[in-house]
Regions:
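A generic helix-loop boundary/linker signal
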Residues: 74-75, 127
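Long amphipathic N-terminal alpha/beta scaffold segment
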Residues: 68-69, 75, 105, 112
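Hydrophobic/aromatic-rich core segments of domains that either
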Residues: 84, 103-180
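N-terminal accessory/pre-domain segments preceding catalytic cores
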Residues: 1-67, 84-94, 111-112, 120, ...
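Short coil/turn segments at secondary-structure boundaries
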Residues: 72, 93-96
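A short, contiguous structural element within a folded domain that forms the immediate neighborhood
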Residues: 77-84
Length: 180
């Protein structure tokens, strides 16, 4: 049986990249469990322990095929999976601001083997002192959950990603993945 994309799938395409392979529900659930754990850590213990959780995160078993995707296809997959990561975030932290949104997306995509990173930045010209900092998620330098121009108005303070995922992508090698 041939997999048919929904009629609205063109809205999620970031380029003319080929369609990524579908993500089985079992992998989505495992990635969502990691996202829920990470969100609880962020809520209860703050950014320090939460960003260490992301750095130490290992992709879930079965995610090798997504880690090997070329960047345009991986970005397209990431855009298609945003709903799942944000569903977990909306359940656990309905009023979560940019850090919670970006963090949940980065954890979810990293669990799928994509080298997504959370970017924390300071506004260059503060219009509102209450919101002088901002956060977004990036994959291969492309902003996933904000306007692409956000990179121009902020000075990056910190970029956090899953060390194993980023190292594997940089080295172009496969690393054995730990199971939970």
């Amino acid at each position: 049986m041939r997999h048919r994309a929904p009629d609205w799938a063109f809205l999620l395409a970031s380029s003319d990249a080929p369609a990524p392979p579908p993500v089985p529900m079992g992998l989505r659930i495992r990635a969502a469990v990691h996202t829920a754990r990470a969100m609880r850590i962020l809520q209860k213990h703050g950014w320090g322990p939460a960003h260490r959780y992301l750095q130490q995160l290992r992709p879930v078993p079965g995610s090798d095929r997504y880690a090997a995707l070329p960047p345009p296809t991986a970005i397209r997959l990431a855009r298609q999976e945003i709903l799942w990561s944000q569903l977990v975030r909306r359940i656990l932290e309905p009023d979560g601001l940019c850090l919670a949104r970006s963090f949940s997306l980065a954890v979810y995509l990293s669990a799928l083997g994509l080298p997504c990173e959370v970017t924390v930045a300071r506004e260059l010209v503060a219009n509102n002192p209450e919101f002088g900092f901002h956060s977004w998620a990036e994959l291969y330098g492309e902003v996933l959950n904000d306007a692409p121009v956000v990179q121009r108005g902020f000075r990056v303070l910190q970029r956090v990603s899953a060390d194993d995922t980023a190292a594997r992508r940089a080295a172009g090698t496969q690393i054995d993945m730990a199971t939970d």
